[in-house]
């Protein structure tokens, strides 16, 4: 089964998305937190054996360098170099933001003109499912990366994991839906409480993605960095407003 993630136009697009979650000036954003979220996202994709293109890995290497510089003792020369790398990164993100806004403005003007000169296209275009309240797939992956890291630590401490030959996404989809029986919503991390190993955790997550893709589930996150909840999608159901 092919699950298509939200496509970013490149690593700067992903970083801009992460920075925008803080709703503050780019130069005031806690860059170490942004770096950790980026690296967690890339690591999660790799753990799920999903393809990560080279440019994302190059950026990951640069971010790891910035992070390591910030962890070094406060030696003046090293600090200056670390600050330069950080400021250069933030400048790249800010410059990318300006170009993206300009591109969106030009595209909007183009669409306005097209309405007067041509018939609107009738082709139906499938778009990847997004979280309600303008949350995107990346927010779901960031939440899952934290869950996966905690479960890995839990399994390592227990020293015992129950292994099976194979976990099927179709079977896990049934488990996810059954978890919502009798509930209005289910906190995402609670879905993985009974998982016995990493493979089961990942398959459960893939099943959740598939249920979102088929519009059987919706997800609610009331605020940035807040808990994500699963809800069964019902006819003409109203999503709680934040």
UniProtKB/Swiss-Prot annotation:
Which cell locations does it reside in? Cytoplasm
Origin: domain of life: Bacteria
Question: Principal place where this protein is found?
Answer: cytoplasm
Record-level GO cellular component terms: cytoplasm
InterPro entries hit by this protein: ScpA (IPR003768), ScpA-like_C (IPR023093)
Key words, A-Z: Cell cycle, Cell division, Chromosome partition, Cytoplasm
Which is one Pfam family of this protein? Answer: SMC_ScpA
- List all membrane-crossing ranges: none
One GO-annotated biological process of the protein: cell division
Q: Which NCBIfam families match?
A: PRK00104.1-2
Subunit notes for this chain? Component of a cohesin-like complex composed of ScpA, ScpB and the Smc homodimer, in which ScpA and ScpB bind to the head domain of Smc. The presence of the three proteins is required for the association of the complex with DNA.
Q: What does this protein do?
A: Participates in chromosomal partition during cell division. May act via the formation of a condensin-like complex containing Smc and ScpB that pull DNA away from mid-cell into both cell halves.
Q: Which family does it belong to?
A: Belongs to the ScpA family.
Q: What is this protein called?
A: Segregation and condensation protein A
Q: Which organism is it from?
A: Streptococcus pneumoniae (strain Taiwan19F-14)
């Amino acid at each position: 089964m092919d699950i298509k993630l939200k496509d970013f136009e490149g690593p700067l697009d992903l970083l801009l998305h992460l920075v925008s979650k803080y709703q503050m000036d780019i130069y005031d954003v806690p860059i170490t937190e942004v770096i950790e979220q980026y690296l967690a996202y890339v690591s999660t994709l790799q753990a799920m054996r999903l393809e990560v293109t080279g440019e994302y890995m190059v950026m990951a290497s640069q971010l790891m360098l910035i992070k390591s510089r910030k962890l070094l003792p406060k030696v003046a020369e090293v600090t200056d170099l670390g600050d330069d790398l950080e400021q250069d990164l933030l400048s790249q993100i800010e410059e990318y933001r300006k170009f993206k806004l300009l591109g969106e403005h030009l595209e909007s003007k183009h669409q306005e003109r097209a309405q007067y000169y041509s018939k609107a296209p009738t082709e139906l275009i499938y778009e990847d499912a997004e979280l309600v309240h303008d949350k995107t797939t990346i927010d779901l992956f960031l939440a899952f990366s934290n869950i996966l890291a905690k479960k890995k630590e839990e399994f390592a401490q227990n020293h015992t994991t129950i292994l099976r030959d194979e976990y099927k996404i179709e079977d896990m989809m049934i488990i996810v839906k059954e978890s919502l029986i009798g509930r209005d919503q289910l906190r995402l991390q609670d879905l993985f409480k009974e998982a016995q190993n990493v493979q089961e955790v990942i398959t459960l997550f893939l099943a959740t993605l598939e249920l979102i893709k088929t519009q059987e589930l919706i997800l609610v996150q009331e605020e940035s960095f807040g808990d994500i909840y699963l809800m069964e999608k019902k006819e003409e159901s109203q999503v709680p407003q934040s």
